[in-house]
């Protein structure tokens, strides 16, 4: 029997396993245990974090063991702004499934969605689709390279797992400064070294230097993440792109529709050459879109960009329904309100209990942290104890339309009980001894 073969006696039925048993099995069958790094239990509280769900509705989750939680974490990394299993989106998807989600012909929803996206973004003329953020960004980079006949890319921020992006780490650990540390470029061709050039958000001089000394096909950047830009920064980026004939690509995969119906770039007054959407555009169903100006997007016809499941009917149906709901509800205002409420009360709680609690970033993508040398232990203890109180909690809170003031206040009340223990643990210097689980991980690490 080879190493990869599984004895028949070990092939247990997954529906008979609890959360921890199933995750241990997953680690044997799936490299890394999960498909998304941010869903690894090791990123929260190893051995106690519920890896699997049975039901998810609104902002509540029932795990595989039947326990009910209010999700006060990142809510699937902000993918479901309307809340889990939104009835309007689900109804549109169910209608498409019943009518057939895939066949030899194309779904007319592709055209309706394209019309809707171009209507929302007057600067854009054309649309291409994919089903995930990383691949949509790769499409945008391919189109930019085809349009300019150039190879190099300037970027800032986090842009996924693709070769074009991870090539930045072939010369050293530079991507750790752009959100996620530990991104080893194993498997990325060494020939891509020197094709991508990172710059820090807000550092216009660094970008100017890149453009002066190289010939980038595109500037790829998030419009914002942890803070709003300083006056003149985005305008300066736009000017540099225009002067150098470089395609400006705005990555809205994370910022998405959280700050404005149509994307953060619209709130900030910047008109790119291309914008990329995923996650929030379809409220939990696989869908992504690249929109852009016709003189750039036309280049997609000169390069082979094609895939069968980019034509399924579910993604466009979900996206149309999601966008319609966002047009009818002021989602950004609600996210701002709920996030700001949580950040304010988190900071006040820290002051009340003399715990080094710190709220950072923007309300729609808030970070609720501990400013302490043992902050990883604190977070692990906090997450473990909040599970006992019926809350999924990590180091960030991405609110949804389903969250109410009652959800936020209930979370803060429960956190106050846990802060009492954290305060005592700091005073007694016994944080580690209180943990019944390994300390949480940060960044990308191999699971042994």
PLM regions with names:
Residues 15-55:
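Active-site-adjacent loop/helix segments that line or gate small-molecule/cofactor pockets in enzymes
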């Amino acid at each position: 029997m080879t190493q990869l073969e599984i004895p028949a006696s070990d092939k247990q039925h997954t529906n008979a396993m609890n959360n921890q048993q199933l995750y241990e099995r997953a680690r044997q069958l799936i490299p890394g245990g999960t498909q998304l790094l941010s869903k690894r239990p090791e990123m929260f509280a190893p051995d106690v974090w519920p890896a699997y769900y049975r039901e998810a509705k609104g902002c509540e989750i029932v795990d595989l063991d039947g326990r009910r939680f209010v999700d006060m974490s990142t809510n699937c990394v902000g993918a479901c702004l309307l809340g889990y299993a939104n009835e309007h989106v689900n109804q549109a998807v169910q209608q498409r499934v019943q009518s057939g989600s895939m066949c030899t012909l194309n779904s007319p929803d592709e055209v309706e969605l394209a019309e809707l996206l171009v209507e929302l973004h007057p600067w854009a003329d054309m649309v291409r689709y994919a089903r995930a953020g990383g691949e949509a960004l790769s499409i945008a980079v391919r189109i930019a390279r085809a349009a300019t006949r150039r190879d190099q890319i300037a970027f800032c921020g986090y842009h996924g797992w693709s070769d074009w992006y991870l090539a930045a780490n072939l010369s050293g650990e530079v991507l750790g400064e752009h959100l996620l540390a530990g991104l080893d470029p194993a498997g990325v061709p060494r020939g891509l070294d020197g094709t991508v050039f990172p710059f820090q958000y807000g550092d216009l001089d660094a970008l100017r230097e890149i453009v002066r000394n190289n010939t980038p096909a595109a500037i790829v950047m998030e419009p914002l993440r942890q803070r709003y830009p300083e006056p003149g920064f985005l305008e300066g980026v736009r000017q540099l792109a225009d002067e150098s004939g470089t395609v400006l690509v705005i990555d809205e995969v994370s910022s998405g529709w959280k700050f404005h119906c149509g994307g953060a770039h619209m709130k900030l007054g910047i008109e790119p050459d291309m914008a990329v959407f995923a996650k929030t555009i379809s409220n939990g169903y696989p869908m992504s879109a690249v929109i852009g100006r016709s003189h750039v997007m036309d280049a997609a016809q000169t390069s082979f960009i094609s895939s069968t499941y980019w034509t399924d009917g579910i993604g466009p149906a979900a996206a149309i329904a999601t966008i319609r709901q966002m047009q009818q509800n002021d989602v950004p205002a609600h996210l701002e309100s709920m996030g700001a409420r949580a950040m304010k009360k988190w900071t006040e709680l820290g002051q009340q209990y003399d715990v080094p609690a710190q709220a950072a970033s923007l309300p729609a993508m808030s970070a609720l942290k501990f400013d302490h040398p043992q902050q990883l232990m604190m977070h692990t203890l906090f997450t473990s104890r909040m599970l006992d109180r019926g809350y999924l909690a990590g180091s960030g809170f991405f609110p949804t339309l389903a969250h109410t003031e009652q959800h936020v206040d209930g979370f803060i009340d429960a956190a106050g009980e846990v802060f009492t223990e954290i305060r005592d643990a700091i005073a007694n210097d016994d944080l580690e001894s209180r943990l019944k689980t390994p300390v949480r991980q940060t960044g990308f690490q191999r699971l042994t």
